[in-house]
A protein has these predicted regions:
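Active-site activation/catalytic loop segments of kinase-like enzymes and analogous catalytic loops
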Residues: 112-121, 180-216, 228-248, 260
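Short, charged, amphipathic alpha-helical segments
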Residues: 254-258
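Glycan-recognition and catalytic cores of secretory/periplasmic carbohydrate-active enzymes
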Residues: 90-93, 97, 101, 108, ...
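Histidine/acidic-rich helix-loop-helix segments that form or flank divalent-metal centers
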Residues: 216-222
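ATP-binding pocket architecture of kinase catalytic cores
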Residues: 1-109, 120
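An alpha-helical support segment within catalytic cores of ATP-dependent transferases
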Residues: 88-100, 105, 110-150, 220
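Active-site acidic catalytic loop and adjacent metal/ATP-binding pocket
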Residues: 1, 83-84, 138-184, 194-195
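Short, solvent-exposed segments of well-ordered alpha helices
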Residues: 67, 101, 105, 194, ...
């Protein structure tokens, strides 16, 4: 068992609700056994200490992924459509924290985080009015495909655990209603994963194949729209890393920016 004491009651409630909802849908998430009346404390299942990030360490360091590592990645990316569609089925998105859905406001928050914590922090020269115009255009493009699916938001190898050779999901409490592309971009373009392009393309095909169980896929449109989400996710991460590196003075995050 793992005992958890969470400072944010809203975030705790999001996790507790989602964990129960996902388990009811047959998704591999930790079981919560008991919670306090105020939702500050709870006991959950211990999934061990094997992160997918660590399980693919050799591949990350050499960019040469062995068959066992590839198989773990295939299993994980093929699980994603089930999370997005089955996970969204019957979900009360009002529990999501801090936002119930991926919308223009949340997009502009992330883009302005990128502007203030990365562009301005690095002293980069740009025309602010034109940048704001581009931000609005990007928001319009990202929202042009309506969706009722679950968006994990931080679907990457540090948030997947390996138990008995299978992927299990953690740290999903920041999820919300949103398009499928964001999580694909988060997973396959994670900077420190160091996936070679050939492996990334292989995993994209695995994802699309699994996605077809839930909806028809226009591959040309899918790839075109995914490009915009890869750019957006990269900007969002650079903003977060910029804040940690330039404002909190943590050199590790400045080094991570260089990987992008």
């Amino acid at each position: 068992l793992i005992g958890v004491s969470g400072e944010s009651v809203e975030e705790n409630r999001a996790f507790l609700y989602m964990a129960e909802h996902f388990r009811q849908k047959g998704l591999p998430v930790p079981q919560v056994f008991i919670r306090s009346e105020d939702d500050i404390y709870y006991l959950q299942e211990d999934l061990g200490d094997s992160l997918l990030f660590n399980a693919i360490e050799k591949g990350r360091k050499t960019s040469v992924f062995g068959e066992e590592e590839k198989q773990l990645l295939r299993k994980t990316i093929r699980l994603l459509p089930a999370v997005q569609f089955a996970g969204a089925d019957g979900m009360d998105f009002s529990y999501c924290y801090p936002q119930a859905e991926f919308n223009s406001r949340s997009i502009l928050w992330d883009l302005n985080y990128f502007k203030y914590c990365f562009l301005k922090a690095t002293g980069m020269d740009f025309q602010e009015d034109r940048l704001e115009d581009d931000f609005q255009k990007m928001a319009d493009v990202l929202l042009r495909s309506s969706s009722a699916t679950f968006m994990y938001r931080d679907f990457q190898s540090r948030n997947v655990m390996i138990k008995d050779g299978e992927p299990w999901l953690i740290d999903f409490q920041g999820g919300r209603k949103g398009p499928v592309y964001y999580d694909v971009a988060s997973f396959l373009w994670q900077a420190k994963a160091n996936y070679p392009d050939s492996l990334r393309q292989e995993l994209l095909k695995e994802y699309i194949d699994a996605l077809r169980k839930y909806q028809p896929v226009d591959e040309a449109y899918f790839y075109a729209q995914l490009r915009h989400f890869v750019l957006f996710r990269t900007m969002q991460v650079l903003g977060a890393y910029g804040f940690r590196g330039y404002f909190e003075k943590k050199p590790h995050f400045i080094q991570s920016c260089l990987l992008y």
